[in-house]
Amino acid sequence: MNSRRKFVGALLAGAVAVGAAWATPALSADQVIRVGTLKLIHGITPFFYERFTPAGYKFEIVTFDTPTDGKNAVVTRSVDFGTYGLAAATLGGAAGEPVVIIGAQCNRGMAVVAGAKSAINSIKDLAGKKVAILPGSTQEVVILDRLKMEGMSIKDIQPIRVSFSDMPAALERGDIDAYVGAEPGPSISVAKGVGKIVEFPYSTPTGSVNMVMTTHQAMLKDNPDLVKTFLAMHRKATEYAMGNRGAFIDMAMQKLGQPRPTIEIAAPNVELTWNTDADWVTRAKYYGSQMLEMKQIRQLPDYSSFINTSFVAEVARLK
């Protein structure tokens, strides 16, 4: 009888030990937050998150080549949060996809570039020229709006689909006459002596609004505390990067694989940001109206749910 008690006791002790062995890692494991961003200098903020990550969390940063890929990752919940252009987000929202803008990522970061020795010195000079544009990008709507301001339309140029990363090389080869690009592309062309800036296209009512921070609609309901925690880190990382130009340039060089001269040219054309104030929302809605007018979307997103400023407003009140 005594030996039986010892056997049962040993068995129970073993079970407790095994349970503890399994339980300890589960209790101590950090929650992984997956964030998608683009391979652009103005998408660099997520790489600074680690510096401001509170205990119990860690980040996994996933990079995408196109805004649409970034948006789709949010829709499919492959990432928890994702930053990409306003255009891709608006396309998703207008199509009824469960994507919500919860903050901003950057302003500026775009430029119209032409061959350094070309006679293209203004938007009007693009008439009849081969111009690289990435469909579905924020730049696409901006350049169409700029053409309209000059009394022109897409029919007055020869639009060619080229990804942002391929634009500098296409210009250097002579495949195109100009492009509407995203940093560091324009600065690569300038630094190599291949291209020149025709203009920074920020004179439309859209202004310099560019990339947004988004999440899946379900995240707002299922884990609002995580959204607040994330946006607080996003704000801190943004303000740190903008306030420490050296760290900003070093990180961009490391993650984008570009030399210092190129990044130093690009940096002044990038404004990392996080807040979506009333002026920002007005510009974003104007941008959506242009997409509708240009028949890029069939209807406007439901802005009452597509842009949620409540979380970023709470973060704005933090010191």
Language model: regions and residue ranges:
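Short, glycine-/small- and polar/acidic-enriched structural segments
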Residues: 27-153, 158-164, 177-183, 194-200, ...
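N-terminal secretory signal peptides and thylakoid transit peptides that target proteins
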Residues: 1-14
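Secondary-structure end/capping motifs
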Residues: 222-298
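Pocket-lining segment of extracytoplasmic ligand-binding domains
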Residues: 87-88, 160, 165-254
